[in-house]
Amino acid sequence: MSGLGARDIGHRVVVRHRIPGGLTDVIGVLQSWAPDSLTVRHADSSVHEIRAVDVTAAKTIPEMPLRPVDVEQLFLATALGRPAVETSYVGHWLLRASSGWTGRGNSLLPAGSPGMPVAEALKHTEAFYDERGLPPQALVRLGSPEAEALRSSGWVDARPSQSDVLVMHTTLDHVNAAPPYDVLVAEHPTDAWYAAAFDGPVPEPAPAVLEGAPNAVFASVTLDGQVVAVGRGSMTGHWLGIDAIRVDAGYRRRGLGTAIVQGLARWSGPLGGRRTYLEALLENTAAMATYTRLGYREAYRYRYLTSR
């Protein structure tokens, strides 16, 4: 096979092979190799099985460099991938409320112009949250003009003891390998999914938030007759957002979280998914190590600010 072998499994390759009427090239990750055939996984998650007798040339090629991300676009995509129960706008600023469940679902997302002086926009923001009995909070991208504007207006850290939240990204071909477990991807979460996702009762606003995106799915792995790992995926354009990953304490360090990511990546490929993002607290060293090993890199960091 022109130099490819089992040692190249997991590496990026190009394979030229015969098809009816001519030759074609397949570029992707070498997923399996045998003396009589090989399989290549394309970036869109499709798998190409090629007979050895049809291969005319094949070689490893360098990893595709991770292109710089459009941070502003990703900042907005994260909000669309997990929409709040209630939303309102002040210019381009997005106000979100979800009965207090999660910071993302109950905070201002200041992106772009509010269409009025910042001080006036912040008064609208405080009124919005006061009317709902919620503390006024803003999710701000560190280093952004909006973050500086809010701090200059007297807004301070809402969670000073918590580390920064990292939004991390990579291309789909880094994470769409075949998972080592059977990953079920469903359009609707089951009671067993929710039981695995939460300790104790499910917060009342959670289903509306988690199921509110127009193109969201719910992944799970079942072992020993019980759901032991779950996660959620949502598509916004070519972006796959992954969140709500949770693994039962008795089943950790077995690659189940990685399997959930891979299962969701393989679901999104045929739907046009090309890039993926997720979030992790900087202090969550185990998650950071896993995601970095999978090829995720930091896009930006955020914190929550409050006026009180």
List each language-model region with its residue ranges.
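N-terminal charged segments
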Residues: 1-10, 20-26, 31-33, 46-131, ...
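SH3/SH3-like beta-barrel fold
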Residues: 15, 37-45, 50
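Acyl-donor-binding surface of acyltransferase catalytic domains
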Residues: 81-84, 94, 101, 118-195, ...
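Conserved acetyl-CoA binding element of GNAT-fold acetyltransferases
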Residues: 104-113, 238-249
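Conserved acetyl-CoA-binding loop-helix of GNAT-fold acetyltransferases
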Residues: 118-126, 244-249, 253-270, 289-293
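Conserved GNAT acetyl-CoA-binding A-motif
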Residues: 132-141, 268-279
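Conserved beta-strand-loop-alpha-helix junction that forms the acyl-donor binding cleft
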Residues: 139-146, 249, 278-288, 305-308
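Flexible, substrate/cofactor-facing loop regions flanked by secondary structure
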Residues: 177-244
